[in-house]
């Protein structure tokens, strides 16, 4: 069975075509295309501008994806699109595109939860059995485990997502958004050597990132080279703190928080596996820290590369086809989108 997936919940529009050869067989990725809306340094991406970008690219990406996949329209079983969560205007653009090609091609539609798409793609690529899932992206931060045909949320952010924290700090430092701010922060962090104290916001199984961001933004004012030397930000030893040091300190602090709550979830559910998904999951330092924790417990960590960690259409096609095979079809009048669509709202009928 073959499905096409349309993803556009944030600043990336992705189209993917996938084939499921049969039960218990590895899915075949036929095409996986993506284009990113990039805003100037110091700026985020506005929903209206992002939606305009998606509408400008969606038709050509659909054509290219189908052509690259080497399939005919009649071979496609269903059209899968991101129903939510995400930003309203970009989601509407993708939903409109899905409805349009459904009517043109005469194919059924399946609305997919963005978070479940990340999880199922991660499981398919890494072959992780029944892991605790750390889902970290620009809009979401959740610690998840599967139970009784639901992906249960054991911990999450109490305010902003970890990716949003990183992106906003990148704007403070005027770090470029190309290819994406989190990657550029990561590269600067690799050059940092001084660990600056930042608030540590773990509340039981949940985490808070807004206070850390506010503290980092305040410290960043001390990096201004036009300030008198005595007012510049320094370490306790009197060494000047650099933007690389602040990026390093931010990463070390927020990733340590994620490791703590993930380890607690592993102990609770008795799992020896961690699957890291979402755009922030492509960060090498996060994977390294999570791997150290997992190995100390005799376990292992699983993650994918940026083709599948970062938002993409193939994960929507994969999760949508799994739902479709259980009899799920979204009626045309229900092909709406919602900015708030929790992971645990989805009935996972394709798992035992």
Swiss-Prot record:
Positions bound to substrate: 135-139, 167, 182, 186, 283
EC number, UniProt record: 2.3.1.234
GO MF annotation list: chromatin DNA binding; metal ion binding; N(6)-L-threonylcarbamoyladenine synthase activity; nucleotidase activity
Subcellular location as annotated: Cytoplasm; Nucleus
Signal peptide range in chain numbering: none
SUPFAM superfamilies reported for this sequence: Actin-like ATPase domain
PROSITE patterns per UniProt: GLYCOPROTEASE
UniProt-annotated binding residues for a divalent metal cation: 114, 118, 135, 311
Record-level GO cellular component terms: chromatin; cytoplasm; EKC/KEOPS complex; nucleus
InterPro entries documented for this protein: ATPase_NBD, Gcp-like_dom, KAE1/TsaD, Kae1_archaea_euk, Peptidase_M22_CS
The protein's required cofactors: a divalent metal cation
GO biological process assignments: positive regulation of transcription by RNA polymerase II; telomere maintenance via recombination; tRNA threonylcarbamoyladenosine modification
Xref: Gene3D superfamilies: 3.30.420.40
Coiled coil: none
Domain of life: Eukaryota
Main location: cytoplasm
Reaction(s) catalysed by this chain's protein: L-threonylcarbamoyladenylate + adenosine(37) in tRNA = N(6)-L-threonylcarbamoyladenosine(37) in tRNA + AMP + H(+)
Entry annotated with the keyword Acyltransferase: yes
Pfam families: TsaD
NCBIfam families for this protein: arch_KAE1, gcp_kae1
Oligomer and partners: Component of the EKC/KEOPS complex composed of at least BUD32, CGI121, GON7, KAE1 and PCC1; the whole complex dimerizes.
Purpose of the protein: Component of the EKC/KEOPS complex that is required for the formation of a threonylcarbamoyl group on adenosine at position 37 (t(6)A37) in tRNAs that read codons beginning with adenine. The complex is probably involved in the transfer of the threonylcarbamoyl moiety of threonylcarbamoyl-AMP (TC-AMP) to the N6 group of A37. KAE1 likely plays a direct catalytic role in this reaction, but requires other protein(s) of the complex to fulfill this activity. The EKC/KEOPS complex also promotes both telomere uncapping and telomere elongation.
Protein family membership: Belongs to the KAE1 / TsaD family.
Name this protein carries in UniProt: tRNA N6-adenosine threonylcarbamoyltransferase
Organism annotation: Phaeosphaeria nodorum (strain SN15 / ATCC MYA-4574 / FGSC 10173)
